[in-house]
Amino acid sequence: MDKELLAMLVCPRCQGKLKYDRERAELKCHFDGLAFPIEDEIPVMLEEQARHMDADEKLGKAPGEARDATS
């Protein structure tokens, strides 16, 4: 993914910063809990195409990471 393109892209819902997830080929907005797919190196920035992240992923926890005592 081109770093210059990444620097220009924002979440279409909140205009917040996006985090690039290379493993899943997605751009993630942790504020809104949306993950936008990247297809053939082109970000698909449509809310209808975005995946909704689960609560742990939205908080930035890795899959299988233990929850703290307050969760």
Curated annotation (Swiss-Prot):
Belongs to the UPF0434 family. HAMAP family: UPF0434. This is UPF0434 protein Csal_1588. Coiled coil: none annotated. It holds the Pfam family Trm112p. GO terms for cellular component: cytosol.
